[in-house]
Amino acid sequence: MLLLALSDAHIPDRATDLPVKFKKLLSVPDKISQVALLGNSTKSYDFLKFVNQISNNITIVRGEFDNGHLPSTKKDKASDNSRPMEEIPMNSIIRQGALKIGCCSGYTVVPKNDPLSLLALARQLDVDILLWGGTHNVEAYTLEGKFFVNPGSCTGAFNTDWPIVFDVEDSDEAVTSEVDKPTKENQSEDDDAKGGSTGKEQPGSYTPKEGTAGERENENESNVKPENQFKEDEVDMSDSDINGSNSPSFCLLDIQGNTCTLYIYLYVNGEVKVDKVVYEKE
């Protein structure tokens, strides 16, 4: 059984469509048994129509930017034209073979994307595999016998809470060391205050330096630092790092008995790359 996991399409707010190569890969009829939409993927009718063509067995969970309700696929008996509204659940469970698969968007997990919080949710749902979205980044790891999979954003939409890491501890240590370290000026002032009659210069006194005016001018020029020394180092950042966008990705789970083979599809530089991870229930 093949289970397709899609998340965070954000169509039409942040993206227009799936990559063309993704659509060609997923357009094979009668190949994928079920589709899981893990949030932020219900605002585009064309996208939902395409997903329904992949498989009419679709599990949808509510994302942070989804509406609370979605038109039902079943027509209302009282009226042939209207369709009742169905509430989109926060969590859902899929049972395939010997495995139970939990689905959630992940924005209700606090702290967000925290492995221990996700483990607590997996235990609460009593599932072997937990699929979650909301971060726009692909992740797959095993924790205490449970398998955690995040398919990323299928369109590569930008993430508003894209993390930026600063080395705060290192900078604090550097500042502390500079503050604690006595400067030469402070040492000289202390020596002058203690010197008294030792023949050292007193505050406010001035003793002209020996040498010609030309020598003194050359010495002053040598002490001037070049302008290039004050320029900051240029940081090499890609466009995706600047605008917070991500590489489009999705996951395909091949479930056979108590074994799950995960295929991770990444769209990088116009090419589709595939990684494989195998999980077996203990």
UniProtKB/Swiss-Prot annotation:
A GO CC term assigned to this protein in UniProt: endomembrane system
Segments of this protein annotated with the region Disordered: 173-242
Gene Ontology BP, a term: endocytic recycling
Pfam families: Metallophos_2
Biased composition, class Basic and acidic residues, residue ranges: 178-187, 212-232
Family matches, as InterPro entries: Calcineurin-like_PHP_lpxH (IPR024654), Metallo-depent_PP-like (IPR029052), Phosphodiesterase_MJ0936/Vps29 (IPR000979)
UniProt keyword terms in alphabetical order: Protein transport, Transport
Keyword Protein transport attached: yes
Entry keyword Transport: yes
Misc remark: Present with 259 molecules/cell in log phase SD medium.
Family the entry assigns: Belongs to the VPS29 family.
Quaternary structure and interacting proteins, as annotated: Component of the retromer complex which consists of VPS29, VPS26, VPS35, VPS5 and VPS17. Component of a retromer subcomplex consisting of VPS29, VPS26 and VPS35.
Function per UniProt: Plays a role in vesicular protein sorting. Required for the endosome-to-Golgi retrieval of the vacuolar protein sorting receptor VPS10. Component of the membrane-associated retromer complex which is essential in endosome-to-Golgi retrograde transport. The VPS29-VPS26-VPS35 subcomplex may be involved in cargo selection.
Name this polypeptide is given: Vacuolar protein sorting-associated protein 29
Naturally occurring in which organism (per UniProt): Saccharomyces cerevisiae (strain ATCC 204508 / S288c) (Baker's yeast)
Organism classification: Eukaryota, Fungi, Dikarya, Ascomycota, Saccharomycotina
